[in-house]
C-alpha cells in the first residue's frame, strides 16, 4: 500500500519506521530540516510530489494544533479513493471535518507517546479506533496495532472524548498542582523523584495539546471531583480523624 504520513515529528517518524518495510511510504513536512531524520521512505515538501505518489492512505501525524490545517493543505493533491486518517489525542472538530470532506476516513488514538512509553515494548499500552470510520481503514489499523501488541478498544467519537477527559485531564491537572506547590529538594525521596520525572514530562508536552485537554468541555467535572476529594482529605487531616481515613485505591478498570 502507498501510505503518506503528514508530519516528521516523533509520532510521524515512529509510524514511518513501523510501516516502511512492508509498505511504500512517504513523509510530507513543510520544514525540510525535520525530514533529515526519517529513513527508508520518500521525503516530500510539495503538493506536486504527493500528486505523483498517489497515496492510498494518509496518516495525519501533525501536532494537535495543526491536524486540520494539514488535512486542508493536502486534500487537493489526493486521489478521490484515498482513505485519510488521524492519530490525534484530541479530536475537537474532526468529526465535523470528516463528515463534509468527501473522503473515506478512519480515526484512531494510540494512547502512548514518546514522552513516557517504551516504543519498543508496547504490550501494556492501549489504542482506540473510532467506530464511525471506514471499514477497510479500521481493519488496517486494527491489524497494525495488533502487530504492535497494543490493547485495542473501539469507541465512538463521543465515547473517545469522554475517555480522554478522564484519562488525560485528571493526571495532567494533578501534575500541574504538584508542579505549582513543590519546592526544590536537595535530598528527595523516591516518590518525590518519580513525581518530578512525570511532571517534567507532562510540562514538556505541546502547549496546544495541554490547552485542548484542559479546555475540553468534559474536563471541569473531572477537576470538580479532584477538588471534592481534596476538601474531604483536608477536613480529615485538620480533624486528625483516623476513623474517616482510608487509603485510596484505583477504581476497577482505571488506568494510569
Spans of model-derived segments:
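ADP-ribose/adenylate-binding Rossmann-like module
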Residues: 78-93
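An accessory alpha-helical subdomain
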Residues: 154-247
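NAD(P)+-binding Rossmann beta1-loop-alpha1 motif at the extreme N-terminus of oxidoreductases
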Residues: 1-42
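Active-site regions of enzymes building and remodeling cell-envelope glycoconjugates
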Residues: 39-47, 102-105
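Rossmann-like NAD(P)-binding element
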Residues: 49-71
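Rossmann-fold dinucleotide-binding core
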Residues: 90, 94, 98-151
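Single conserved hydrophobic/aromatic residue that forms the stacking wall/gate
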Residues: 245-256
Amino acid at each position: 500500500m502507498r501510505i503518506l504520513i503528514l508530519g516528521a515529528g516523533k509520532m510521524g517518524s515512529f509510524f514511518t519506521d513501523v510501516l516502511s518495510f512492508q509498505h511504500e511510504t512517504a513523509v510530507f513536512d513543510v520544514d525540510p530540516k525535520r525530514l533529515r531524520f526519517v529513513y527508508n521512505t520518500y521525503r516530500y515538501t510539495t503538493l506536486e510530489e504527493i500528486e505523483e505518489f498517489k497515496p492510498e492512505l494518509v496518516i495525519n501525524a501533525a501536532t494537535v494544533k495543526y491536524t486540520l490545517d494539514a488535512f486542508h493543505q493536502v486534500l487537493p493533491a489526493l486521489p478521490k479513493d484515498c482513505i485519510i486518517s488521524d492519530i490525534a489525542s484530541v479530536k475537537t472538530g474532526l468529526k465535523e471535518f470528516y463528515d463534509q470532506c468527501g473522503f473515506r476516513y478512519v480515526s484512531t488514538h494510540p494512547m502512548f507517546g514518546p514522552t513516557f512509553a517504551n516504543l519498543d515494548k508496547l504490550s501494556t499500552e492501549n489504542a482506540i479506533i473510532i467506530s464511525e470510520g471506514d471499514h477497510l481503514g479500521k481493519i488496517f489499523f486494527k491489524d497494525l496495532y495488533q502487530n504492535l501488541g497494543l490493547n485495542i478498544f473501539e469507541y465512538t467519537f463521543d465515547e473517545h472524548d469522554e475517555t480522554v477527559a478522564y484519562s488525560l485531564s485528571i493526571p495532567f491537572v494533578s501534575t500541574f498542582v504538584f508542579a505549582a506547590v513543590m519546592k526544590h529538594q536537595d535530598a528527595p525521596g523516591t516518590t518525590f523523584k518519580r513525581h518530578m520525572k512525570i511532571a517534567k514530562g507532562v510540562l514538556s508536552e505541546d502547549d496546544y495539546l495541554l490547552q485542548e485537554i484542559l479546555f475540553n468541555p468534559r474536563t471541569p467535572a473531572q477537576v470538580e471531583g479532584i477538588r471534592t476529594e481534596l476538601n474531604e482529605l483536608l477536613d480529615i487531616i485538620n480533624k486528625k480523624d483516623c476513623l474517616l481515613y482510608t487509603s485510596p485505591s484505583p477504581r476497577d478498570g482505571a488506568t494510569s
